[in-house]
Amino acid sequence: MVRPRRYGSFHVYDEIKSGFHTRKAILSLIPKTRIDSDTGRFHTRGPMPVSVYIQSVAYFLLAAVALFASAGTVAIATYWVYLAIFAAVFIVSFLWLDPDLARERIRPGGKQPPITLQLISAVLVSHWIIAGLDHGRFHWTDTVPPWLQWLSLLALAASYALCLWAMHVRFFSSVIRIQNDRGQVVITTGPYAYIRHPGYLAGTLVMLASGLALDSWLATAFLTICTLPFLFYRAVAEDRVLLTQLPGYRDYAARVRWRLLPGLW
């Protein structure tokens, strides 16, 4: 007798007498359903929460207003490229990432560090305002060479790409917790084959490159000082949680020694 197993709103048969069809073949006929190559689990994509679209558009508009209003002009080419990178990141996120990830990131709970993500958002907005005032009005430290501004924009795009890659291959939560509801396991593919916390490496590079891309040494210093200690603290705290609570992570950490920077840390 063939027993159905229910995943999401579908019944999938583990065995079929003819032997011709496989579970993967059946799932290929179901839209927005995939097999996780690492865990063997089935994921059925639902719609992206509307609140995620609203938050993303609001965040983009906030960045644009903070930059151009503080600068007093919209005639800054690098600022438009900066915002275009933002827009591209949002679009790729909507098309590529699991909507369950978005639901997790906007859901309260977990073990938040002392410095909350809301405070980090406030710091980001503040550094946009500082950069705009510096470059567009007061010219305190707007002496970043043009080649370094464009190089920083490339670094920014690469950093966001690394972050999206990490989020795609492993469920990337905004809180520190073991995700038992998703059957969390150790992932050793993608960027996790080389460093244990590629998402934090991407975040570090974003914080270093953002102010430079906006032509402000002052904004760069402000953002770096305010955020890098938080990112390093969070990487260490998450490592401790995973070492004690996630089966197999200790062996993985022994194989992949580096948290963020291969050869350094």
Locations of regions flagged by a protein language model:
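Short intrinsically disordered, low-complexity coil segments enriched in acidic
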Residues: 1-4, 8, 12, 102-103
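Acidic, Ala/Val/Gly-enriched low-complexity intrinsically disordered segments
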Residues: 2, 12-15, 25, 36-38
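Membrane-anchoring alpha-helices and their flanking helix-loop junctions
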Residues: 17, 21, 29-189, 201-265
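Histidine-centered phosphotransfer motif of kinases
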Residues: 193-201
